[in-house]
Structures are given as C-alpha cells and as structure tokens.
Amino acid sequence: MISKRLDMAAWVLLGAICLTGCGNYSNEDLDFQLALPEQSDIAVKMQLSVTRYNSANYYLATRSAITTFNNMVVDLTGLIDVVRGYTPTSRNGAQRIWGPFPSDKYPAWEIRVVMQRSTVSPTILHMDYWVQVRPVGQGDSAWVSFLTGNYESHGSARTGAGEIHLWANDVRTAGYPVDDDPGLVNLDHLDVTYDNSAYPITVTMTIVNLPTTPTQSGTYTYSQNLDGSGRMTFDSQGVTDTGVPITANMTSQWLGSGAGRADLTANLTPNLPTPSILLLGTDCWDLDTVASYSYRLRDSVTNVPSTTGSIDTCLF
C-alpha cells in the first residue's frame, strides 16, 4: 500500500538546517518539543530472534509487518524532528513557527512547521501541530497541510494520547509533487492514534488508498503490556479478481520472550451485518521461532487441510 520508507524526512530537515540554528531555547519551547511523538512512543516492540530456515511462516509475516509499521513510524516522526533539533523561527504567545524555508527537493515549494499550545486544565496540556507546504511567493492562504497532529498530556509531559495524520491527496490536489515518491502514489491519507498514558500502550495506524486501488485500506492495531507481551492485528480490505469485497485479518500475540501465535482469517461478507469469518491458518512458535503447531485450511502443495504439531503447545 505504501512503501516501507516514505522518503520525506530529509527535505524538512535539510531545509531547516539551512535557515535555523541551535541554542536560544526558552523554557516554554521545551513544552512544544516534549509534545511531539518520538519513535519509541509508537513503535511496535517485540523480542526478535534470529530466523531459521524453518521459522514459522506466520512468525516471519508478523516480523515483516512490525518492520513495515516501524519504518513508517520512523518517517512520520522524522517529519517533525526538526522541532526538537532547532529553535523556532518565530514565537507568538502560545504559537511557535519553524520556517518557512525552501524545499531542497522542490525549489518551487517552501515548507513550515506550526505548533499551537492550549491548556485543558492545570495538569493537562494540549498541543496541535502542522507541517505545511505552499508554492514560493504565495500568501498565507496557499499553505496546505501535509501532516497534522495533536497531543494531550496525562500525568507527565511524555505520557498521554495523540494523533498523526498524513494528507497525501490534499497536497497532491494542490500541485505538490507527492507522487514522485512511489510509496505515496496510491495513498489518499494515513491516520495514527496512540495512547501511552498507561499500560497497555495502544497504537492504531490506518492507511486509506485512492478509490482506484485494489487494496483500498489497511489497519494496524498494536498493544503492549508492562511485561513486554504484545498483540498486533492487521486488517486489509479490498476486492477479489472477480470484484467480490473481502477482508483479511492477521492477529499475532507474543510473550515478552518473543514466543507467540498468529492466526489468519478472512471475512467473506464484509458488507453484511453478520460477518462470515473463515480461519485460513494458525502458527504457534517457541523462542527458536520454529512452529510447534501449524494449521492451514488449504495446504500450498496439496490444496487440502493440513495440521502439524499439537495445538496444546500454543501459548495463546
């Protein structure tokens, strides 16, 4: 749906380096910096083991999904890391602005980062932020938001709940050459919500593609417990080659050690009130990542149901 790396953080950071410097922070600037999500706030954490030639297929699929998810997190947080590394260009009460500065990649465009602070209560701080682009020489009405987000603290500056939104089609419509990145050609928008105020930590990432793409949307849902155990689901919604809507789901669960289980299901009636869920397969694995139990509704070779190992070995 989108590439593992969005390849966008560099043009923000390079432009900022050219026009801003380090130092001269005010104490209030720290509030703005602390409100922005870091990679560790929303990345999936799973104890990864060295893969083997016979590692469980669904363990490998889980590992691949985590890598894809975390790479997208790196790129999204990279877009706003400039706020942590450099002083604001302007300060106006509860607002901070970085830029505008020219885009290294597209000289006809310029970029800015805007943050706005508001106080919900004496112990809760709310922050909104925007990464925006516009053609050089245009007025304020020409700014279009590429990325928007918000954060609300709970208990401390680094714990709370927030959202991040990437608006690929909005900047595409405005003429920004977003489709130069192959990973964004099919993307309409991407949404992330997260809450790290208490365990379990939760993160949801929803990818919405343009209506013309076969895979129209996908959703990652992740939760992490205090003991390091976790759970991740990935839903993919699209149509078959005969035009029939279908939803596939993989749900993976693991202990802090990395041992776990994954189930692959399909909803054959996603548009009906009562779903028709079909279990396509299950893998359970130990610390060595090798399947202790494996079930397939259709074996890839024989095309008949197959089972190896005992389901009693599954930890979930």
Predicted features, each with a name:
Residues 16, 20-22, 282, 312:
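Secreted/extracellular small peptides and ectodomain modules produced from precursors
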Residues 79-177:
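Short N-terminal edge-element motif at the start of the domain
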Residues 1-20:
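Sec-dependent bacterial lipoprotein signal peptides
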